[in-house]
């Protein structure tokens, strides 16, 4: 283990307010869920300190901006149109047909993914991962469930993996009705189209770490495909450091006609599930006030920092919940497997266009029809996903063994971590915020060391440690537990 240390008494605190900096991004801001939520600096300034500087979000570099610009609303529209053309993509609709049902959709998705991979010079591969699901909840007879996975293998750290999925199965009102048309244009051809579009873009840009882009099945019947994928990765000891679930990301208009075209919600669970964290660690997390600093919430903060900007044209509204109220999604299986995972969903769902038989009643059109999809909005959500995934993959790995010394009773904070021996790590940053702030508000670069003493009380702020790459990309922060 390599430890180096630094002790700080004070440092320059910049007078600029994060609100003032971010307000120059010239975005429409129907909802603010980042530093722009603060009406003035005073809200972010307690406890007062002359340590560090106010945190400025990581800007996309020229390469990432160019990649984000490649995400095409026209391509996404064409993909959703094709997926809708299969009539139904119900998990049980395993018809012997090349034009209708989930198998036909699966084969087309795989064919398109392979076309993209052919442009990658061998850095992207495509796999159709299948298994037979026996009779279970919402599965009245054995059925083959298939996930289509495009893997962009990392050039420098291929064993560090990030996953993004959308589900390509669909449904109508009766979850067991696999005969009727179930277009599923928004739920979730929109997320599937984003996964496919990102595969197209990433085939031409090899990331430093591995990115898996998946179209998964069985979601509407009980998250079967994604859970199988998560367990397969866990069983092979795959180091998944983040998972993004795109589900119902195709409409900017709510059921009351309200429009919010520049915001995407990011749902992030608090304390990890009992399958992912020991009871002792869970009890300690609650004792020290770490319930808002789970790996999932650090991932959501990271996405808000790197993907809410004028390159994507979007804001990321973090929601402190596993999912919508009493609902679930394909990130759940990853969380249960111990992986950080979040869900993106449009800001205002229209339930007349979700899980509905196609019909018109009293002048209201029901059904998940393509006419209700906003392709420009969906493309912007794709840009958020791309900016998040690329920033994760290009950054160094998260710091390991991050601890805070609780043996000394004073108003300094002593934080320790293992210094990486990787040459892509330039330094480490301590980030912090008040206990009521959603996002990190302050930062201090302490160099390539493994120990720091700060004149800030651990009683008053929340700390995190993140790695800074030689390329300028920064990892998600890691919350320190008592040593």
UniProtKB/Swiss-Prot annotation:
Its cofactor is Zn(2+). Binds 2 Zn(2+) ions per subunit. GO terms for cellular component: extracellular region. It comes from the Eukaryota. Its EC number is 3.4.-.-. Disulfide bonds: none annotated. Glycans are attached at residues 96, 121, 235, 310, 362, 401, 411, 421. Keywords: Glycoprotein, Hydrolase, Metal-binding, Metalloprotease, Protease, Secreted, Signal, Zinc. GO terms for biological process: proteolysis. Zn(2+) 2 binds at residues 187, 220. It is an enzyme of class 3 (hydrolase). SUPFAM superfamilies: Zn-dependent exopeptidases (SSF53187). Residues 1-18 form the signal peptide. Residues 396-483 form the Fibronectin type-III domain. InterPro entries: M28_fam (IPR045175), Peptidase_M28 (IPR007484). Zn(2+) 1 binds at residues 167, 187, 247. The keyword Lipid metabolism does not apply. It is found in: Secreted. CDD domains: M28_like. GO terms for molecular function: metal ion binding; metalloexopeptidase activity. Belongs to the peptidase M28 family. M28B subfamily. This is Probable zinc metalloprotease PTT_08196. It comes from Pyrenophora teres f. teres (strain 0-1). The lineage of its organism: Eukaryota, Fungi, Dikarya, Ascomycota, Pezizomycotina.
């Amino acid at each position: 283990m390599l430890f180096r240390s630094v002790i700080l008494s004070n440092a320059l605190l910049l007078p600029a307010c994060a609100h003032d900096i971010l307000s120059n991004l010239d975005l429409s801001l129907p909802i603010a869920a980042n530093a722009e939520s603060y009406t003035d600096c005073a809200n972010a300034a307690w406890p007062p300190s002359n340590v560090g500087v106010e945190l400025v979000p990581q800007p996309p570099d020229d390469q990432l901006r160019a990649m984000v610009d490649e995400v095409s609303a026209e391509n996404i529209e064409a993909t959703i149109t094709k997926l809708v053309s299969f009539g139904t993509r119900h998990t049980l609709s395993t018809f012997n047909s090349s034009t209708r049902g989930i198998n036909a959709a699966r084969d087309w998705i795989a064919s398109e993914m392979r076309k993209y991979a052919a442009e990658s010079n061998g850095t992207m591969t495509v796999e159709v991962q299948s298994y037979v699901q026996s009779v279970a909840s919402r599965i009245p007879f054995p059925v083959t469930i298939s996930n289509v996975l495009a893997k962009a293998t990392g050039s420098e750290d291929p064993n560090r993996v990030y996953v993004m999925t959308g589900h390509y199965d669909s449904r109508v009102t009766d979850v067991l009705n696999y005969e009727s048309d179930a277009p599923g244009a928004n739920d979730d051809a929109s997320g599937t189209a984003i996964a496919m579009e990102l595969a197209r873009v990433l085939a031409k840009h090899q990331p430093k770490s591995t990115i898996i882009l998946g179209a998964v099945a069985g979601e509407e019947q009980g998250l079967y495909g994604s859970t199988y994928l998560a367990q397969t990765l866990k069983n092979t000891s795959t180091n998944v450091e983040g998972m993004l679930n795109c589900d119902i990301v195709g409409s900017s208009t709510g059921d009351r006609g309200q429009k919010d075209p520049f915001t995407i919600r990011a749902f992030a669970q608090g304390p990890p599930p009992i399958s992912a964290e020991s009871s002792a660690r869970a009890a300690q997390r609650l004792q020290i006030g770490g319930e808002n600093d789970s790996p999932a919430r650090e991932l959501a903060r990271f996405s808000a920092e790197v993907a809410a900007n004028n390159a994507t044209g979007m804001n990321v509204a973090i929601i402190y919940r596993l999912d919508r109220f009493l609902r679930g999604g394909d990130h759940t299986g990853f969380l249960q497997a111990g992986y950080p995972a979040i869900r993106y969903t449009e800001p205002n769902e229209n339930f007349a266009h979700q899980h509905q038989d196609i019909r018109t009643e009293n002048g209201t059109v029901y059904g998940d029809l393509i006419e209700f999809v906003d392709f420009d909005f969906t493309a912007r959500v794709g840009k958020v996903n791309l900016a998040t995934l690329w920033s994760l993959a290009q950054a160094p790995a998260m710091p390991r063994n991050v601890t805070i010394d609780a043996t000394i009773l004073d108003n300094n904070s002593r934080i320790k971590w293992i210094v990486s021996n990787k040459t892509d790590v330039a330094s480490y940053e301590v980030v912090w915020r008040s206990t009521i702030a959603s996002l990190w508000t302050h930062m201090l670069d302490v160099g390539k060391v493994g120990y720091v003493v700060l004149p800030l009380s651990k009683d008053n702020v929340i700390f995190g440690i993140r790695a800074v790459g030689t390329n300028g990309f920064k990892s998600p922060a890691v919350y320190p537990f008592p040593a």
